[in-house]
């Protein structure tokens, strides 16, 4: 049948199964750990900490030690990943068609206008 109403267009969204449907309240705390935004926040965290490590160990020629303020700025990127950040990352991902590359671009945007731009 091809003339059915597309269920994906119904608002509020329809649950895919009982976990995000009738048990949503029970499993809601898991969203911070098992959702796609949680995965992307962890990716941001890993990329930021890896960059801090590379700078601290001078592992890549041309890097320099970061100031305490720069480290704090970097660590704020995953810490401040909120609904607006989730939407921005999704927008970047639509453009790049690559979830991890979108993380890189997201970080780059956050560093625009700072001492770490470039």
What is each residue range found by the language model?
Residues 2-118:
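A helix-coil-helix interface module used to build multimeric assemblies
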């Amino acid at each position: 049948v091809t003339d059915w109403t597309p269920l994906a267009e119904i608002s509020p969204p329809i649950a895919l199964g009982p976990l995000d449907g009738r048990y949503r309240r029970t499993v809601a705390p898991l969203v911070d750990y098992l959702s796609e935004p949680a995965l992307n926040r962890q990716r941001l965290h890993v990329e930021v900490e890896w960059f801090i490590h590379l700078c601290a160990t001078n592992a890549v020629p041309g890097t320099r030690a970061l100031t305490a303020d720069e480290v704090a700025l970097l660590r704020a990127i995953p810490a401040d990943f909120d609904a607006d950040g989730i939407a921005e990352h999704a927008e970047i991902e639509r453009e790049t068609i690559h979830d991890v590359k979108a993380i890189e671009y997201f970080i780059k945007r956050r560093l625009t206008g700072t001492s770490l731009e470039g």
